[in-house]
A protein has these predicted regions:
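Conserved ABC ATPase "signature" region
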Residues: 98, 113-131, 156
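A short, flexible loop at the N-terminus of ABC-type nucleotide-binding domains that lies
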Residues: 1-5, 9-20, 27, 68-70, ...
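Helix-to-loop junction immediately C-terminal to a conserved catalytic motif
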Residues: 49
Length: 260
């Protein structure tokens, strides 16, 4: 399944945030969206997920206009991890992750074996199986972040939309999230669009990078083509060095002035 934004313009009231944005993620492809604060990244995720209707342009899910699809079909197709944790605080971790199975269930009161299996797998993969019976309200921000990701994985959607999936996570769990998403893309052939702040993570995990600034796409291509000092410095307005890791061959990024 693919997802595509076609000349999207969007905003809030009279405040325009996105202007003529086009991008796409195909089956088996991870697209990272980078850009400074206020670039429109989270607004883009809201439009792609159907939470915000565009003022102009269309979002296509496998070639079909998202605005014309039933909510149930969208829920089965799109898994979303928003920027701010939206987990329900009155529930346990297991109950929240089970909510990811709702699009596949005829009744929330009827849990099937495949639902239990999907939830157990998501809990294990997100390293929160030991928290399954804990109340979400008792968890740290990083733990709640992993609950939100586990819910999206349990959903088994064909498209993942992630807004800063590694926010609030320590280094180990941030790497684990990258590995998990990469595995979903490669093993299940899903399409993924992920907003990232970590330039190094985009270089390591993504197939393509979209650079967003001022509500417009400034660059779109493989990491080695987009993660160039001249492009990044113009967008982020800080000194940036890019080098190639000798072992992996991947670019890595150093930001800010270096001094001894």
């Amino acid at each position: 399944m693919s997802i595509e934004a076609c000349e999207i313009s969007a905003g809030y009231g009279r405040d325009a945030v996105l202007s003529g944005v086009s991008l796409a993620a195909r089956a088996g492809e991870w697209v990272a969206v980078l850009g400074p604060n206020g670039a429109g990244k989270s607004t883009l995720v809201r439009v792609l997920s159907g939470m915000l209707a565009p003022a102009a342009g269309r979002v296509l899910l496998d070639g079909r206009d998202l605005q014309g699809l039933a909510r149930a079909e969208i829920a089965r197709s799109l898994g979303v991890v928003p920027q701010d944790s939206d987990v329900a605080f009155g529930f346990s971790v297991r109950e929240v992750v089970m909510m990811g199975r709702a699009p596949h269930q005829s009744s929330l009161l009827r849990v099937r074996a495949e639902d239990e299996s999907a939830v157990s797998s998501a809990l294990e993969r997100c390293d929160i199986a030991g928290l399954a019976d804990r109340a979400v309200a008792e968890l740290s921000g990083g733990e709640r972040r992993r609950v939100t990701l586990a819910r999206a994985l349990a959903q088994e959607a064909k498209v993942l939309l992630l807004d800063e999936p590694a926010a609030h996570l320590d280094a180990r769990h941030a790497v684990s999230v990258g590995e998990l998403v990469r595995e979903e893309v490669d093993r299940r052939g899903i399409a993924c669009i992920a907003v990232l702040h970590d330039l190094a993570a985009a270089a390591r995990w993504a197939d393509r990078v979209v650079l967003l600034a001022g509500g417009k796409v400034r660059a779109d291509g493989p990491p080695a083509e987009v993660l160039k000092p001249e492009l990044l410095e113009a967008v982020f307005e800080i000194p940036i060095r890019v080098a190639i890791d000798a072992e992996s061959g991947l670019p890595y990024v150093v930001t800010g002035r270096l001094s001894k």
